[in-house]
Amino acid sequence: MRYRVTTKFYVWIFHYNVTKGISKRVILLYNLKRGTSSIFRCCLCEKLNFFPVWFLFLFFIASHINILFFFFLDVLWFLWCYLCSGLFLFDVFSHLPGTLCEVQFFRLWIDGLSPIRYFIPQH
């Protein structure tokens, strides 16, 4: 499943098989201007097999209320991903283009863009 944002961000939500045949959900968000060389977010959710849809509503509301509150939710998102995956920096997908690294997710605040504001489903 792929969603296109009317700005310059894309979000992919899919399952990827890693070692021992475990299917983990991977969430990637990267900057289209720089292509796959600048990936902002990647979460491996091992313990939960569903995507927290309620986070989308919180992000949408927060992005229209206060940028600090939106930042706070992004930190919560990061902690949720960390608790689910037990990983902070990882290179599991080193064979894929780009660098999968949670550190770069703060770049969203430099750009001042909401990653989930205008979702358009694509098939």
Swiss-Prot record:
Partially overlaps RPC19. It comes from Saccharomyces cerevisiae (strain ATCC 204508 / S288c) (Baker's yeast). Keywords: Membrane, Transmembrane, Transmembrane helix. This is Putative uncharacterized protein YNL114C. It comes from the Eukaryota. The chain crosses the membrane at residues 53-73, 75-95. GO terms for cellular component: membrane. It is a multi-pass membrane protein. It is found in: Membrane.
